[in-house]
Curated annotation (Swiss-Prot):
It comes from Acidobacterium capsulatum (strain ATCC 51196 / DSM 11244 / BCRC 80197 / JCM 7670 / NBRC 15755 / NCIMB 13165 / 161). One of its GO terms (biological process) is ATP synthesis coupled electron transport. Keywords: Cell inner membrane, Cell membrane, Membrane, NAD, Quinone, Translocase, Transmembrane, Transmembrane helix, Transport, Ubiquinone. The keyword Secreted does not apply. It is found in: Cell inner membrane. This is NADH-quinone oxidoreductase subunit K.
């Protein structure tokens, strides 16, 4: 059985990659994907903790919480992609520096 610490280290690495890409990249799609990577890193840590606590308490609350986070992430992805498509149609670019103003 793989120790929980390995999953937490992997989750921290994925979250760090997501934060780094969020801070460095200027493309809206890349920023959006880095936010999704951070959400999935948090989901991985929730599942790891749920598996660890399931061995002790025999409860599945962590997996249920991950399911709700995935539902919210799917809704966020749909709304985010719709906003990105609308920005691309109006500005013809996906560069954050060029679409930072909320005007036509």
């Amino acid at each position: 059985m793989v120790p929980v610490a390995y999953y937490l280290v992997l989750s921290a690495i994925l979250f760090s990659i997501g934060v780094g890409a969020f801070l460095i990249k200027r493309n809206i799609i890349t920023i959006f994907m880095s936010i999704e990577l951070m959400l999935n890193a948090v989901n991985l840590s929730f599942v790891a903790f749920a598996n660890y606590w399931r061995q002790i308490n025999h409860q599945f609350s962590g997996q249920i919480f991950v399911f709700f986070v995935m539902v919210v992430a799917a809704a966020e992805a749909a709304v985010g992609l719709a906003i990105i498509i609308a920005l691309f149609r109006s500005r013809s670019t996906l560069n954050v520096d060029q679409v930072d103003l909320m005007k036509l």
